């Protein structure tokens, strides 16, 4: 079977509190699928929406991997059969992985060579703890 790699903003860096808390609630389920999730901590947030299939097919667009994009917003994805585009996006993704942490097979984080940790402030930890409860019944609308 194919390996699925996801590059997402780390919760410590994310600018969308609803998305961050939904990820915290769903993190275990996502990891259990076998996907490798790279939690990005670069200088800027990651805003790329792309799926790469083999070395040719790239799917790019505006779709966010959240419930709001799935059920409420009008989103667009475009499939492009172009090895050159795929190569460019792949290189960007590989670079972003060096600024990321990912869960290893031993359930410990592995850190990219450019990863720099950042702790959540006490206030943000409390805020996220409250939002994690609120997002459960409202998840589809956020």
Residue ranges and their predicted role:
Residues 1-142:
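PLD/PLD-like phosphodiesterase catalytic module centered on the HKD motif
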């Amino acid at each position: 079977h194919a390996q699925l790699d996801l590059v997402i903003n780390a919760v410590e860096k994310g600018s969308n509190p609803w998305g961050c808390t939904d990820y915290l609630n769903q993190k275990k389920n996502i990891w259990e699928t076998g996907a490798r999730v790279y939690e990005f901590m670069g200088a800027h947030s990651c805003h790329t929406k792309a799926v790469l299939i083999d070395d040719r097919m790239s799917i790019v667009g505006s779709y966010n991997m959240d419930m709001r994009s799935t059920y409420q917003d009008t989103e667009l994805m475009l499939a492009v059969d172009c090895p050159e585009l795929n190569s460019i996006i792949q290189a960007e993704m590989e670079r972003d992985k060096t600024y990321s942490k990912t869960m290893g097979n031993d359930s410990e984080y592995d850190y990219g060579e450019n990863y720099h940790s950042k702790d959540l402030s006490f206030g943000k930890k409390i805020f996220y703890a409250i939002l994690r409860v609120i997002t459960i019944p409202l998840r589809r609308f956020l």
